[in-house]
């Protein structure tokens, strides 16, 4: 249920960097802000401590205190790298054959196979255990896959060029709304008038919510 209420900011990591540049921003803290301060027209969702802990610690150096939160954290890791790889393949930055053979052998040669391998590994190694975890072999393969993605996708000049466009777009949006707050939706204009939040925070709230519907 928690994963349904927080969404990634537009353009993923590039969007997060842009929002952090114009105003200190971290998506896990923003996710908690959404469920506490923005949803239900500012009333929040009145979630339990356990759910809020899972949201805040789903992708930080901290660790969720509940098994449910640990499931969210590890699921985020699995989905993140597989979605990025799938996007890179569909975008022509990578092909399946570019993935090192040892990683294809360990994890699978398609997005579906990799996800199945990772999910089954987590289930098998977490059964009757006090923590949610992967096997050491699969965790090593995941680290190697992440290193491969950094070298070939995240730092790829073609991908970086598109990210730079996204960063510039978000920075322009921020500057525009900072100068023209009258065009913000009603809930954000009311927040400007009635809350103690800084104007920059409220503009970040609006831009960070620009996901699929925009």
Language-model features: locations:
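Short active-site segment of divalent metal-dependent hydrolases/proteases
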Residues: 7-8, 79
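Histidine-centered, transition-metal-coordinating active-site segments
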Residues: 28-214
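Short, small-residue-biased leader/transition segments that mark boundaries at the very start
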Residues: 1-6
């Amino acid at each position: 249920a928690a994963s349904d209420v927080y969404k990634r900011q537009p353009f993923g990591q590039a969007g997060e960097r842009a929002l952090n540049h114009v105003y200190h921003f971290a998506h896990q803290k923003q996710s908690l802000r959404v469920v506490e301060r923005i949803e239900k027209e500012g009333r929040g969702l009145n979630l339990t401590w356990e759910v809020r802990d899972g949201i805040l610690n789903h992708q930080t150096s901290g660790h969720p205190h509940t098994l449910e939160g640990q499931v969210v954290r590890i699921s985020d890791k699995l989905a993140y790298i597989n979605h990025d790889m799938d996007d890179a393949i569909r975008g022509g930055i990578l092909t399946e054959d570019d993935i090192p053979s040892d990683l294809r052998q360990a994890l699978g040669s398609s997005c579906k196979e990799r996800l199945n391998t990772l999910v089954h590994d987590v289930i098998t190694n977490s059964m009757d255990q006090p923590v949610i975890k992967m096997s050491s072999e699969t965790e090593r393969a995941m680290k190697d896959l992440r290193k491969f993605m950094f070298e070939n996708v995240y730092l790829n000049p073609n991908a970086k060029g598109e990210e730079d466009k996204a960063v510039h777009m978000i920075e322009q949006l921020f500057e525009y709304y900072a100068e023209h707050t009258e065009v913000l939706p009603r809930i954000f204009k009311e927040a400007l008038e009635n809350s103690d939040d800084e104007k920059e925070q409220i503009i970040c709230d609006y831009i960070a919510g620009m996901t699929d519907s925009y």
